[in-house]
């Protein structure tokens, strides 16, 4: 249960489905509610698949390139802290999808895989976190994947009601949510960085 909770709390703030809402609404503006729901569902299923591939195949990727797991955690921590500062800084560019990519996506028949699933919901930060997760037992591995599914379920619900949430929260509410998610992501990034440094240089913690 602890593994499930840790996976959910860590990933949810990094995935940050609230940040995906504006792009989702822009790209599905002309769709009916049923089609919008199908797009959100497909994107969340793709997200679980992407994170699962990163989780199960990550160690093989690290071994192939000769990368130490702690080095990956340091890189992931820096990446998360950078993303967090973008969310916390007023007026900073918070778009995960550039204007050119956004314009191109408007003409695509299916936007669920890209740009929604990747990079909006499962970007480099979330994939780095999944690769860095070490689960020694099959039960822990299963709980981790279940955690991915719970994050996807939460993201699906948020995207499904994104139009109503945007109307209720308004711009001030959305900005507040971005700062809350940014603060949590910053704390997670610092924790990843500090834990990796402590593992590489145990003498520093004495």
Residue ranges with predicted function:
Residues 32-33, 53-76, 155-200:
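Transmembrane-helix boundary and interhelical-loop signature of multi-pass inner-membrane proteins
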Residues 37-91:
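Membrane helix-loop-helix hairpins that form the core translocation module of multi-pass transporters
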Residues 79-101, 189-199:
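Transmembrane helix exit motif
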Residues 1-14, 90-91, 97-117:
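Small-residue-enriched transmembrane helix starts and helix-helix packing motifs
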Residues 26-37, 105-108, 134-140, 171-174:
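Juxtamembrane helix-boundary/capping and inter-helix hinge elements in multi-pass membrane proteins
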Residues 9-12, 21-28, 114-119, 126-136:
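Generic transmembrane alpha-helix signature in multi-pass membrane proteins
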Residues 3-53:
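Juxtamembrane transmembrane-helix termini in multi-pass membrane transport proteins
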Residues 3-20, 69-79, 143-155:
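Structural signature of hydrophobic alpha-helical transmembrane segments
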């Amino acid at each position: 249960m602890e593994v499930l909770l840790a996976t959910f709390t860590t990933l949810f703030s990094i995935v940050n489905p609230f940040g995906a809402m504006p792009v989702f609404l822009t790209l599905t503006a002309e769709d009916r509610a049923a089609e919008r729901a199908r797009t959100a569902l497909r994107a969340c299923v793709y997200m679980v698949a992407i994170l699962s591939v990163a989780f199960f195949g990550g160690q093989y990727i690290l071994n192939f390139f000769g990368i130490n797991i702690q080095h990956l955690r340091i890189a992931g921590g820096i990446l998360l802290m950078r993303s967090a500062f973008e969310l916390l800084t007023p007026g900073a560019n918070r778009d995960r999808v550039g204007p050119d990519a956004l314009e191109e996506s408007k003409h695509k028949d299916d936007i669920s895989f890209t740009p929604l699933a990747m990079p909006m919901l499962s970007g480099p930060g979330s994939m780095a976190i999944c690769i860095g997760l070490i689960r020694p037992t099959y039960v822990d591995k299963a709980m981790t994947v279940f955690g991915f599914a719970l994050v996807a379920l939460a993201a699906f619900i948020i995207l499904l009601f994104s139009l109503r949430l945007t109307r209720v929260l308004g711009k001030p509410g959305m900005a507040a949510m971005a700062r809350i998610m940014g603060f949590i992501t910053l704390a997670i990034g610092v924790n990843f960085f500090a834990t990796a440094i402590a593992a590489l240089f145990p003498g520093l913690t004495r």
